[in-house]
Curated annotation (Swiss-Prot):
Entry's Gene Ontology cellular component terms: mitochondrial inner membrane; respiratory chain complex I
PANTHER family assigned: NADH-UBIQUINONE OXIDOREDUCTASE CHAIN 4
This protein's record includes keyword Translocase: yes
Keywords assigned by UniProt, alphabetized: Electron transport, Membrane, Mitochondrion, Mitochondrion inner membrane, NAD, Respiratory chain, Translocase, Transmembrane, Transmembrane helix, Transport, Ubiquinone
Coiled coil: none
Domain of life: Eukaryota
Protein name in UniProt: NADH-ubiquinone oxidoreductase chain 4
Annotated GO MF terms: NADH dehydrogenase (ubiquinone) activity; ubiquinone binding
Enzyme Commission number(s): 7.1.1.2
Pfam (any one): Oxidored_q5_N
Entry similarity comment: Belongs to the complex I subunit 4 family.
Subunit: Core subunit of respiratory chain NADH dehydrogenase (Complex I) which is composed of 45 different subunits.
GO aspect biological process, one term: mitochondrial electron transport, NADH to ubiquinone
């Protein structure tokens, strides 16, 4: 893993010592080279090549998320160029350095071998994200959004620390690799049920579970483009990754404790999808659609079957790329129209036809059109939940229908209709923006053709 972490850290001095006109080019090109090198390193024929270290390792669960994390840094830097045009040179450098440090923390989080180390890095990702949201957000509400984001995630994860320290004392080790070999089953007592709640709450807030999701639309709407991209694509996946890892520790209690959370997720999935149908703010709509998709992932993880885990992994990766792409498209609209209200951005298809094509593809992947990887993830989850309980098919089917409705509503509102008078003099699409869309869609296309890249050789 150091082959990824050290070059990424070295990007920070590269940015600070670059000539003013070369900052963006250097940061983008070198981060893209690092991500491509990491992809080739992670694509090893045997599992043991990266597992020599006792601190960092990669396995079938963390590798897809590591790939997504490294791939996203050049895309965030590409997307942020216009947003930071009028900023001073030092602020541009600080911004890029924060993105790079966030990437380092995320790579280390996904490859940590030990729970306490994972927890420390899990919390460390908050700091750069919070600075990015509160300093470079668009409106003054960003401070309120930052406060929500910080307090929800911190309050959720404090009980986790206490639970981890207790488990460390009782088990002797919290190493992921050792825990798989230890057969200590936890009894379903009151105290152990509370411990399960303490362990899961941090990840359920991060996912977020319906009811604990209020920080997410605020943070997404107020964050700058890179903040929205990293929040949607990776930070929500930290919750899913942590839940999958911690179910090893809490194996028998999860079956006993999962019912209320499964029902809340299934209900929340319908509710947040329905909320999307009456949104006027474009970024808010995409944020609520993220909550709806993540509810599916929570259901899959709590069911705990191999199929549901495969579905959760596939949907997390697919959603990461799709939601990031949608935020980029929303940002390209915002840069031209200076408003996130969908009614003001109508009729853009006649002015920007290529951008309308990207919107169409993004909306179709969001509603899980065959043969995309989104559909594969959703199908695996629907089948796993159906085998758990036949009644879930009603809620899942309703959710699929509403997802299609709000995706098409978003597409038709922004692209169709007669354009408003203030959109006459907007700038055409840049090559940078089109490259950004292609770099989002290329991995989605690749995964749709060959899902075994992330689902393993068993698929």
């Amino acid at each position: 893993m150091l082959k990824t972490i050290i070059p990424t850290i070295m990007l920070i001095p590269t940015v600070w010592w670059s000539k003013p006109h070369m900052i963006w080019i250097n940061a983008t090109v070198y981060s893209l080279l690092i991500s491509l090198t990491t992809l080739s390193l992670l694509n090893q024929p045997s599992d043991t090549n990266l597992n020599f270290s006792t601190t960092f390792f990669s396995d079938a669960l963390s590798t897809p998320l590591l790939m997504l994390t490294t791939w996203l840094l050049p895309l965030m830097i590409l997307a942020s160029q216009h947003h930071l045009d009028k900023e001073t040179l030092t602020r541009k450098k600080i911004y890029i350095s924060l993105l790079i440090s966030l990437q380092v923390f995320l790579v280390m989080t996904f490859s940590a071998t030990e729970f306490i180390l994972f927890y420390i890095l899990f919390e460390a990702t908050l700091i750069p994200t919070l600075i990015i949201i509160t300093r470079w957000g668009n409106q003054t509400e960003r401070l309120n959004a930052g406060t929500y984001f910080l307090f929800y995630t911190l309050m959720g994860s404090l009980p986790l620390l206490v639970a981890l320290i207790y488990l460390q004392n009782s088990m002797g080790s919290l190493n992921f690799l050792l825990l798989q070999l230890m057969n200590k089953s936890i009894t379903t007592s009151w105290s152990n049920s509370l411990m399960w709640l303490a362990c899961m709450m941090a990840f359920l807030v991060k996912m977020p579970l319906y009811g604990l999701h209020l920080w997410l639309p605020k943070a997404h709407v107020e964050a700058p483009i890179a903040g929205s991209m990293v929040l949607a694509a990776i930070l929500l996946k930290l919750g899913g990754y942590g839940m999958m890892r911690i179910t090893i520790l809490l194996s028998p209690i999860t079956d006993y404790m999962a019912y209320p959370f499964l029902m809340l997720s299934l209900w929340g999935m319908i509710m947040t999808s329905s909320i999307c149908l009456r949104q006027t703010d474009l970024k808010s709509l995409i944020a609520y659609s993220s909550v709806s998709h993540m509810a599916l992932v929570i259901v899959a993880i709590l069911i705990q079957t191999p199929w549901s885990f495969m579905g959760a992994t596939a949907l997390m990766i697919a959603h990461g790329l799709t939601s990031s792409l949608l935020f980029c498209l929303a940002n390209s609209n915002y840069e031209r129209i200076h408003s996130r209200t969908m009614l003001l951005a109508r009729g853009l298809q006649t002015i920007l036809p290529l951008m309308a094509a990207w919107w169409l593809v993004a909306s179709l992947t969001n509603l899980a059109l065959p043969p995309t990887i989104n559909l594969l993830g959703e199908l695996l989850i629907i089948m796993a939940s159906f085998s758990w309980s036949n009644l879930t098919i009603i809620l899942m089917g309703t959710n699929v229908l509403i997802t299609a409705l709000y995706s098409l509503y978003m597409l038709s509102t922004t692209q169709r209709g007669k354009f408003t008078y203030h959109t006459n003099n907007i700038s055409p699409t840049f090559t940078r923006e089109n490259t950004l869309m292609v770099l989002h869609l290329a991995p989605l296309l690749l995964l749709s053709i060959s899902p075994k890249i992330i689902l393993g050789l068993m698929f």
